[in-house]
Regions:
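Core catalytic lobe of class I
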Residues: 1-236, 242-246
Length: 253
C-alpha cells in the first residue's frame, strides 16, 4: 500500500486495490450529494461504499462525511448503526437564492460523524477560549440544584485544582467563511471546495501526527493538503481528470 498518493478513477474500484484492511485512522470525504446537474455530482452506491469503509477503517477510527439535506438523511439512514452525531458548518454566507421566496436561505452544511459498528472513536478536542462570564475559578465549591431534570448528580461539587478556567470544550458549530481567501470567486478550484482551516481543524480533532487519512472523492485535494500541513499521511482518489490534475499540482507545490 502506497501512502501520500492520489489515484485517478472510480473509488469503488480503487479502494479494494490500494487500501489495506484496518489501515485508515480517518476517512474524511465530501461525497457527491446528487443535488446538481454536474457530471461529477452523482451519488455513489452507499451500500458498496460502506462495505469498503468498514473494511479499511481501524476499530476506533472516524468517518467524517460532508452532507446537506436531503442527502444528509439518505446518508445517515444508509448506516444508522454507525452514525454518531453531526457537526454543523456555518458558512457565514447564505445560499439558495433561487428558492428564497419559498424557504429560508441556507447557511449551514452538515459534517456527519460515523464509527465502525458504533465503536468509540478517537477524539482529541481542540479546546476553545471561554467567555469571561462563563469562567469558573479553580478549586471553588458550587451548589447544584436538587431538582435536576437531566439526571445529573445533585449537591455540592468542587472544580479540579487543574481546571483551566480559560478553556472550554468545543461546540458543534463550525464557523468558517466559504467565500474568502482560497474560496473567493477568483481563487476557487472546485465548486464544492471546503476551507482549508476547517479541514485542518477536523484533522486535529480526530487524528495524531503520522495517522493515515483517506479521501476517496478528493476534488481539488484540500484534505490531502491539510494532512500534509499537519504531518499526517493521506490516500486520495478522484474520478474527474481535471480535478485530479489540480489536486496533484496543489500537493506538489
Amino acid at each position: 500500500m502506497k501512502i501520500n498518493e492520489i489515484y485517478l478513477g472510480d473509488c469503488l474500484e480503487l479502494i479494494p486495490k490500494h487500501v489495506e484492511d484496518k489501515s485508515v485512522d480517518m476517512i474524511f470525504c465530501d461525497l457527491p450529494y446528487g443535488t446538481t446537474a454536474c457530471k461529477w455530482d452523482s451519488i455513489i452506491p452507499l451500500d458498496k461504499l460502506w462495505k469498503e469503509y468498514e473494511r479499511v477503517i481501524k476499530d476506533n477510527g472516524v468517518i467524517l462525511l460532508f452532507a446537506s439535506q436531503p442527502f444528509t438523511t439518505t446518508l445517515i439512514s444508509s448506516n444508522i448503526k454507525a452514525f454518531k452525531f453531526c457537526w454543523y458548518w456555518d458558512k457565514v454566507n447564505s445560499g439558495g437564492f433561487a428558492t428564497a421566496k419559498h424557504k429560508p436561505l441556507s447557511v449551514f452544511e452538515d459534517v456527519c460523524v460515523f464509527s465502525k459498528n458504533g465503536n468509540k472513536i478517537n477524539y482529541y478536542p481542540v479546546m476553545e477560549l471561554a467567555e469571561e462570564k462563563n469562567k469558573r475559578p479553580r478549586n471553588k465549591t458550587y451548589k447544584r440544584k436538587e431538582d435536576n431534570s437531566q439526571g445529573m448528580a445533585s449537591g455540592n461539587f468542587k472544580t479540579s485544582e487543574t481546571h483551566n478556567e480559560d478553556l472550554r470544550y468545543p461546540k458543534n458549530r463550525l464557523v468558517y467563511n466559504n467565500r474568502v481567501g482560497e474560496l473567493n470567486a477568483l481563487n476557487r478550484l472546485h465548486p464544492t471546495q471546503k476551507p482549508l482551516d476547517l479541514i485542518e481543524y477536523m484533522i486535529n480533532t480526530y487524528t495524531k501526527e503520522g495517522d493515515l487519512i483517506l479521501d476517496n472523492t478528493c476534488g481539488s485535494g484540500t484534505t490531502g493538503l491539510g494532512a500534509k500541513n499537519l504531518n499526517r499521511d493521506y490516500i486520495m482518489m478522484e474520478q474527474d481528470k481535471t480535478y485530479y490534475e489540480i489536486a496533484c499540482k496543489r500537493l506538489e507545490d
